Swiss-Prot record:
Residues 308-366 form the SH3 domain. It comes from the Eukaryota. This is ABI gene family member 3. Belongs to the ABI family. One of its GO terms (biological process) is regulation of postsynaptic density assembly. May inhibit tumor metastasis. In vitro, reduces cell motility. Residues 33-61 form a coiled coil.
Amino acid sequence: MAELQQLQEFEIPTGREALRGNHSALLRVADYCEDNYVQATDKRKALEETMAFTTQALASVAYQVGNLAGHTLRMLDLQGAALRQVEARVSTLGQMVNMHMEKVARREIGTLATVQRLPPGQKVIAPENLPPLTPYCRRPLNFGCLDDIGHGIKDLSTQLSRTGTLSRKSIKAPATPASATLGRPPRIPEPVHLPVVPDGRLSAASSAFSLASAGSAEGVGGAPTPKGQAAPPAPPLPSSLDPPPPPAAVEVFQRPPTLEELSPPPPDEELPLPLDLPPPPPLDGDELGLPPPPPGFGPDEPSWVPASYLEKVVTLYPYTSQKDNELSFSEGTVICVTRRYSDGWCEGVSSEGTGFFPGNYVEPSC
């Protein structure tokens, strides 16, 4: 720092003053050399003396300029070093300020994280004036207050209590062997008011029908006889006497079906059973050995059509052969395909000759 101060206050100003003094001295030397050269009789000697003064003056000026430039560069270096020192001090001060701020922040965070002990006191404070309580009043329950809410349903308890049985629409008759027949549904008799036939007056057919009807009615109804109604008596065993005609009082009820109605209808004699069908006639040996004739083969085929080929095709686009073994054709030409290859090419015969052609140029002939 002292060196920088010495350069700024002494060395550089002295060098500048020396340059100003040399400037005035060089002007006087120039005037002297000019007068001496004009007044001298020996011009050559005067010229040599002038050259010597000039060389000395230039050397003196160069030395002073170099000395001043060196002092100036030295001053700039010292100022740069001082500036770097100041910058380092400022950076250090900034780091110290940041450290101080971080310490303060940590201290504040520590104060927030400390356990705060509240002074002990009464936590629950009872109110000074309690609200008045409503006196209890018993009210009867209203069980019909929600009757108008929701979807209503029909109450069937009264109807069920009247009839004592389920409705006929909800009854599904099971397929029992006693009542089921082939081709016609079982007949369900009335559940009440069954006619009573005198003993010994029931034939085998009516006895069988009564047993079947009673079994089907019990299986279909699925419910026992209601209280207060007596079950009809069981029919007696059939006798050898012929059944009498039904009395007049029974005419109001439906006539029970006979045995012919309960029995399944006889099979149609015109239609034979599947087991009685005659076996098909054997095929001839010629039909089994010969393959089907090729499509489109007939006596009116042109002469160029081969004896056997795969199919006939019609060209969609014209094609010109690129090789000697290829076919050339125009649009609408008929070709008999004799062989197909996996690469899409086909071999066939046309009216022009035999050769190969692309398979995507043709379509099957109708």
